[in-house]
Amino acid sequence: MSQTNQVPKIGFVSLGCPKNLVDSERILTELRTEGYQVVPTYDDADLVIVNTCGFIDSAVQESLEAIGEALDENGKVIVTGCLGAKENQIREVHPKVLEITGPHSYEQVLSHIHHYVPKPSHNPFTSLVPEQGVKLTPRHYAYLKISEGCNHRCTFCIIPSMRGDLDSRPIGEVLNEAKRLVNAGVKELLVISQDTSAYGVDTKHQTGFWDGMPVKTSMVSLCEQLAKLGIWVRLHYVYPYPHVDEVIPLMAEGKILPYLDIPLQHASPKVLKLMKRPGSVERTLERVKRWREICPELTLRSTFIVGFPGETEEDFQMLLDFLTEARLDRVGCFKYSPVEGAKANELPDQVPEEVKEERYHRFMQLQQQISTERLQEKIGKVLPVIIDEVDEEGAIGRSMADAPEIDGAVYLNEQFDVEPGQIVRVLIEHADEYDLWGTIVEQ
């Protein structure tokens, strides 16, 4: 075969959060549609794309290392993603990068690829691109990104400077994508964005259309429509606006999963004010109590930052007291670290590293105890579990309380007659700090 007829091959490295993963899926889908072949090794690739993360310093370092590796192993590299918004920082370390674009610059990335590795004239791969596009997740679950950007200006965050203000996708487009994914075999949709509860705010919640029917562009309307698809629907990155209360009844009725991922960040009003986050802890506790009264099965996940500038021992104790009272099911904790360009860098009273470390361990120790107690309460119950994989020891799945990658798992030892994506009923027999063990019962 002559050189001109060879199928051009692209290598791809995707880093960062699920939102970045969705961006990678979109670029890969376009490449496959245009006839490019995506290959798993640097040696086989004519060009390598690195989709970067730039949210915190460790992510920046990982991205720079990935770019360096791609340059060393291949030599022709295009960079995109969040770190791409800081072109000078990349060029300083890796001047040989061919092109750099920011996040969700799909057309720009493709244009650069076309320049360095022209599109094939004959396209034998179009028929092989599935209707739902190229997915980087297992077949039975997928991320559904409903918007880009964020209108908040949290002092620890630089996302708006990289991804811009809130830009909601048309609701008809989102629901069409959801329907395609379900038709392709997806059993669980994970709704993601920078701020899921703000969906539609930028469009003044304009009315869109789906299946010939008018639908309001809002999180609640979206949930009502997704509920009709007959699959698991899980909400992530939900800012605690008042209208979040409206989705709890949908969870209680079994229409969407009883699971809320709400990044609360802290419990001290002073620290929350320094972060530019909403700060009524009493109101948050009242709402948590009310949500659980409406939907007793509700799982609450949150993330917090310890060691934020100005955080005193008293502030930190308020956070521990909040954890004790709220008894959240799933919690992530980060030690504050300066992010280039974040307003928090300018705040006085930076907390020493050894104090951050000590507070982090105290926080995790308390939450581990709470998590253990919450999971012990599940022993003896029968829970729906979605199977993720089957290995030599048995099946591994997740309950409604477990999102992939970030939460716990349900282990079904010696259970081999199931397959990924199957939802089974499991009697829970054992629990530790984060995971459950059980046996499948008759369906």
Swiss-Prot record:
The keyword Flavoprotein does not apply. It comes from the Bacteria. One of its GO terms (cellular component) is cytosol. It catalyses: L-aspartate(89)-[ribosomal protein uS12]-hydrogen + (sulfur carrier)-SH + AH2 + 2 S-adenosyl-L-methionine = 3-methylsulfanyl-L-aspartate(89)-[ribosomal protein uS12]-hydrogen + (sulfur carrier)-H + 5'-deoxyadenosine + L-methionine + A + S-adenosyl-L-homocysteine + 2 H(+). CDD domains: Radical_SAM. Its cofactor is [4Fe-4S] cluster. Keywords: 4Fe-4S, Cytoplasm, Iron, Iron-sulfur, Metal-binding, S-adenosyl-L-methionine, Transferase. Residues 136-373 form the Radical SAM core domain. Coiled coil: none annotated. Its EC number is 2.8.4.4. InterPro entries: Elp3/MiaA/NifB-like_rSAM, Methylthiotransferase, Methylthiotransferase_CS, Methylthiotransferase_N, Methylthiotransferase_N_sf, NA-bd_OB-fold, Ribosomal_uS12_MeSTrfase_RimO, rSAM. [4Fe-4S] cluster 1 binds at C17, C53, C82. Residues 8-118 form the MTTase N-terminal domain. Signal peptide: none annotated. Catalyzes the methylthiolation of an aspartic acid residue of ribosomal protein uS12. Belongs to the methylthiotransferase family. RimO subfamily. This is Ribosomal protein uS12 methylthiotransferase RimO.
